[in-house]
């Protein structure tokens, strides 16, 4: 099944992290509270009994000579009547699963090729044309000297004589235990490539159109990125993404966010405006939360018992006017069972107290004399989200638990430039303990 009106692919994959000028807090400097469980059992209540304000405004909740902490936050809680813990099991990407997903982009697997060390004749000819054009340019327009270009051209003409006409078809065997990026295959449509690769011990899969994804709201320094015309409505994009996700080998995934973005090919030969439709693992209206790559997730301890055994289950679907042009699937899992009893949550007033205390712990290192010359930092909490967060099951690497959590999104502002570094702190909604939704090494302990 094809989920594109006119498939658009690109040459290569470029991963770009757009960082603010203000640097995030060094992990080695963070002080962590010693009390993992913050409240007594008799103070807890179910989600239906929990009283939660819509906003939290508190100026100067903590002030010192080196930092000021405040809150001006909206509080986002889905309309749910119950909340239960979930046990999920790993669902790594093996070859048969990858093929099923790949077939949503191509007519059949014969269109997918292995990446060869040797370029094809067509690829070499395209490179020759590009370098000859550069050679014909004026000297000030060239990136290299004529001698350097001619050396490259001579090598390309030599390789052209023995270059294969086509690439080998198929996909490479995927080593699900690989800790880094692992190439699987590529397909060519409209003379552009899309690369299929895996990451994170077989728990994530990217079918990525080439280029850099820039989200609306990106601060260029002299202006904010605004994306107006994508060519389809948000509802049309949602319908296309829903049909695509319904064909994936997944369970209990629901749309949790929509973002406008643009895909920029590195040489700026094309810009594709698109919607990024975000799906999270969901049960009875409560979902995992995607905070995006722009946020710094601060650690709890070096070997946190609340650290994630694999990434949160999140699917990003890239939809342009041509349909689905790519997807990223992190932390694939399947629901094993749902707890029969409802979660007992600490009151939100105690969540606020826990946030105040942990923020103070987190930035107390700035009082040290060695930071005397650093400008004061303003820390402002601007959003709090309620959702599931992944945590480990002690002694079982194939299982994980999804528990309710508060995602506290905030910014660090440095006076010297006024720019804010985004960060997020995650608190267990049942205990108030810090959580760490990042993938960690096997030697870190996990929660029971």
Predicted regions and their residues:
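Helix N-cap and loop-to-helix transition residues
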Residues: 94, 233, 346-347, 428
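Residue-level detector of beta-strand structural context in well-folded domains
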Residues: 185, 315, 406, 423-425
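C-terminal soluble interaction/assembly domains
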Residues: 398-404, 411-448
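Short, solvent-exposed coil/turn segments at beta-strand boundaries
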Residues: 192, 200-203, 317-325, 401-403, ...
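Sec-dependent N-terminal signal peptides of Gram-positive bacterial secreted proteins and lipoproteins
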Residues: 2-28
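Generic recognition of cysteine residues
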Residues: 16, 20-22, 45, 74, ...
């Amino acid at each position: 099944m094809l989920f594109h009106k006119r498939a658009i692919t690109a040459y290569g994959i470029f991963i770009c992290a757009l960082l603010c000028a203000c640097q995030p807090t060094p992990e080695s400097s963070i002080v962590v509270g010693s009390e993992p469980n913050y409240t007594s059992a008799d103070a807890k209540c179910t989600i239906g009994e929990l009283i939660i304000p819509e906003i939290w405004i508190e100026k100067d909740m903590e002030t010192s000579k080196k930092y000021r902490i405040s809150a001006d936050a909206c509080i986002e809680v889905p309309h749910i009547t119950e909340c239960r813990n979930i046990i999920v099991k790993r669902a790594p990407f093996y070859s048969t699963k990858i093929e099923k997903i790949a077939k949503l982009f191509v007519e059949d697997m014969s269109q997918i090729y292995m990446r060869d060390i040797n370029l094809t004749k067509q690829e070499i000819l395209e490179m020759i044309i590009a370098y000859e054009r550069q050679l014909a340019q004026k000297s000030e327009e060239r990136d290299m000297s004529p001698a350097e270009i001619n050396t490259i051209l001579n090598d390309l003409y030599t390789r052209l004589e023995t270059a294969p006409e086509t690439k080998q078809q198929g996909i490479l065997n995927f080593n699900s235990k690989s800790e880094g990026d692992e190439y699987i295959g590529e397909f060519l449509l409209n003379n552009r490539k899309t690369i299929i690769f895996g990451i994170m011990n077989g728990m994530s899969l990217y079918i990525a159109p080439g280029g850099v994804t820039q989200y609306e709201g990106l601060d260029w320094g002299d202006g904010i990125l605004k994306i107006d015309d994508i060519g389809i409505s948000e509802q049309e994009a949602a319908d296309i993404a829903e049909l695509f996700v319904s064909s994936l080998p997944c369970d209990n995934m629901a749309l949790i966010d929509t973002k406008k973005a643009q895909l920029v090919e590195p040489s700026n030969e094309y810009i594709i405006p698109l919607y990024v439709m975000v799906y999270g693992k969901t049960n009875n209206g409560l979902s995992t939360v995607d905070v995006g790559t722009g946020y710094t997730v601060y650690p709890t301890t070096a070997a946190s018992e609340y650290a994630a055994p694999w990434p949160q289950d999140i699917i990003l679907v890239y939809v342009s006017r041509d349909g689905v042009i790519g997807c990223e699937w992190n932390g694939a899992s399947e629901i094993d069972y749902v707890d029969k009893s409802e979660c007992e949550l600490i009151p939100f007033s105690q969540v606020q107290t826990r946030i105040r205390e942990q923020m103070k712990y987190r930035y107390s290192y700035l009082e040290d004399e060695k930071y005397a010359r650093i400008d004061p930092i303003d820390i402002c909490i601007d959003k709090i989200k309620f959702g599931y967060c992944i945590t480990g099951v002690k002694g079982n690497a194939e299982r994980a638990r999804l528990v309710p959590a508060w995602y506290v999104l905030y910014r660090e502002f440095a006076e010297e430039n006024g720019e804010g570094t985004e960060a997020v702190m995650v608190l267990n909604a049942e205990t108030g303990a810090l959580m760490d939704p990042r993938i960690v090494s096997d030697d870190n302990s996990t929660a029971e």
